[in-house]
Regions:
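Conserved N-terminal beta1-alpha1 strand-loop-helix module at the mouth
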Residues: 1-235
Length: 235
């Protein structure tokens, strides 16, 4: 199964186009306070030039649920990523109103051992200090139920993403600072090397292990799916 690759912290249309041209599956726009924070107008301009098949994701942290849904709907984002301490009832409310939700947890969070697809479509596991660029022990994801799609983040770079994939066997990987020339601007060489290294590691695993089946929107198993939701519904 190809490893899903999300490039986060996109702040301009040039980087959005570069990431998609190099083979990224998804790009993320940060609406929460951050060196990579963007406004709706910037995202709208970028989305006009991004191919439809690319997953576009808005990243929020402890934002009002109504605001999350309003921004996602107004811009036509495919999904949202909740990177704060959002309670389950707010997450459920948002999930009823957007296509899919990525929910972030810090590595070692005890909730990861009992997380399930009712809480999020995709679970992102980050370093204890999100955005710090620090690597954590990738073995900490081993206790997550196998039916959960895990998006691995936290200090990933072109130099270590292959080892991270071979160790943690995630559904996908997420990177921001690890492919930057400076905060908010992507480095073309690092982007290319990261995506190539992730694909290579995924291919190596596929060569020796069968692709796991994951549940689609209707609950049926979809072998090797890298789609966060049943894409056919929207076509």
């Amino acid at each position: 199964m190809p490893v899903f690759v999300k490039i986060c912290g996109i702040t301009n249309d040039e980087d959005a186009l570069l990431a998609t041209a190099l083979g990224a599956d998804a790009i993320g726009f940060v609406f929460a306070p951050s060196p990579r924070q963007v406004d709706a107008d910037t995202v709208r301009d970028a989305l006009r030039r991004v191919p439809r098949e690319i997953h576009t994701i808005g990243v929020f942290r402890d934002e009002r649920p109504e605001r999350v849904v309003e921004i996602a709907g107004r811009l036509g984002l495919h999904g949202v990523q909740l990177h704060g301490h959002e309670p389950d009832n707010e997450v459920a409310w948002i999930r009823d109103r957007v296509r899919f939700v990525i929910r972030a947890f810090a590595a070692g969070d005890p909730r990861l051992d009992r997380v399930n697809r009712d809480l999020a479509d995709v679970v992102l596991v980050d370093a204890p200090t999100p955005g710090s660029g620090r690597v954590f022990d990738w073995r900490l994801v081993e206790g997550i139920p196998s039916a959960v799609r895990v998006l691995l983040a936290g200090g990933l770079t072109p130099a270590n993403v292959g080892d991270a994939i071979r160790t943690a066997r995630p559904w996908g990987v997420d990177v921001a600072s690890g492919v930057e020339a400076r905060p908010g601007r992507k480095d073309p060489r690092l982007l290319r090397e990261f995506i190539e290294a992730a694909r290579e590691a995924g291919d190596e695993i596929d060569a020796v292990e069968p692709s796991p089946a994951v549940s689609g929107a209707d609950g049926d198993e979809v072998a090797g799916s890298t789609r966060p939701w049943d894409w056919e519904i929207d076509e």
